Amino acid sequence: MLESPSLTDQPTMWKRLLGGPTCGPVVISLAALFAITLTLDPADCRPGLPEGPGITLDETFNVQMGVFLVDLAPREYGWEIVNPFNLMDAFEAAYNPDHPPLGRLWLGVFHRIVQSIAPPAGLDDAPFVTVSARFGSAVAFALTSLAIGVFTGRRYGTVAGNAAALSLVLMPRLFGHAHLAALETVTNLVWTVTVLAAASLWTRGTRPSDRAAVLVGILLGAALLTKMQAILLPPLIGLWALWHWRGRAIRPLAIFVSVGCLVFVAGWPWLWLDFPGHLIDYFSRTTQRSMLHVWYLGSSLVDRDVPWHYPIVLFVSTLPMLILAAGILGAVSETQTKSDSDAAHTNDYGRLGSPVRTLILGSVLAPLVLFSLPGVTVYDGVRLFLIAFPGWAILAGIGFANIYRRLTAKSRLAAIILTLVFVAQSAGLFLYHPHWLSFYGVHVGGLRGAEAMGLQTTYWSDSFSRSFLAEIVRVAPKGSTVEITPVMHPSQWTELHRQSPLLQRHEIRVQAYADPVAPTGDFLAVFHRQADAPSRRMLLSRGWVPVSEYRTRGVTLASLWKQRDDAGQRDDAGSTKDTKRHETK
């Protein structure tokens, strides 16, 4: 009779788990998940934990639709949801089709899990709870870091894999997005897995196999079901495959695109109700929506008129300096592979022109090129091209490993110092907590330098964090009315109040700052989105006096104002001497 080998007879398995390219990324990803989970609270929903970013503009839309997809529609219709009449009833009345369903479904699943296990305090009557869905983004971010680390480690060595996973975690903009119930982090996960699957499965022979084309096509469909940015994947992978395999790539590309489109259509029931009409409606939204304004180089610009260099400048300026430098090195230098056998591989991972390296670099460049094209709308900092950052983390891991190997050959101490300096970039995560979406690298002078350059310092109302709301409660008498500006959509202020136990306990009413000439509120809360927020001079001229300012790295991101009275006299500089200024720690 055959006996199963004991664990001691399988050193290879344990070596792979504990000492191979998997262990480091697992530890890094779990540490990131733990840190993010501790810092999700926007408004005193988890009073015993550190604060997280404030409720951002789009989160409540995503959570509401996620809860609809996971809880409301299945509860009302069950399996009868597949009935065409029920589909029409469910997906025409309450459903918001501004984005495909998969990302919101992901958030809805984790909303259900958290609400079942550990519902937050003070929001028992809310139809959905944003902070609970935020955990879904935290998990997606950890999985993205893990995928990047394992992929890089298996091809370029353990050091490169660990550095790649860590590079992603140490990007404050991505770390901040991982705290939000938004679609960007889930999109990053599906985009990254699709690119890495193509790089892994399509480079194993003389041409991509049909099976590999089907598998990556399924992932393409999942990406298309998450967010519009996935439309970049077919041209990216198509050009890459044709460049390396010429005519041999035509068949797998046809399979890849066909499967992706089938999965996309099959996974979105809303399309079934009026396929051509709804498909056109979805893809035309980017050109038919209302215009937004962007603050760039000291000017307020319409999103369609932003200069071509905006994505490049924002991408470069929002990366930590050493990760930027390591990524450049990883993009332009030859590198060693994991082992001699890998170096003999037909695709030679370490060579600059190898299929793997070119696809990773292409995944970075494609979003930047798209949003640099004339007439393509771009706004909200790096949010729309956040998919460019995971590929850069891989390049940074490769670049760091190159330097590390050279230093190790000369001086072990120098390699250790390099590692410590690289890890020290985590300082950005602490210094910008909880306003990670306002991070700028030291190579542009940090946030203060970016403000001096005329770059946008905040844009998504995350600066209305727990500390700022607590200041409102401290200053405003019970039952006061606080007006909010700028107002980017009608439900912004109602959802801020609904998701805030702090404001509800103090019976603070919240409303839009709709009439600057005749304000009806007692106080005014401003998040400093420069392109849309009223200027300080205008507020002073309307009779408002600053009460508190919330700053990060010396730059005001949110402020609280009240109507002028005898207790708040302006000095010649146009400010009040009793204004409190709070610096986030």
Segments from the language model and where they lie:
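Transmembrane signal-anchor helices characteristic of membrane glycosylation enzymes that use polyprenol
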Residues: 20-59, 67, 74-76, 86-89, ...
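Transmembrane-helix signature of polytopic, membrane-embedded enzymes
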Residues: 23, 28-30, 117-124, 146-170, ...
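Start-transfer (signal-anchor) and selected internal transmembrane alpha helices
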Residues: 1-43, 143-146, 153, 250-262, ...
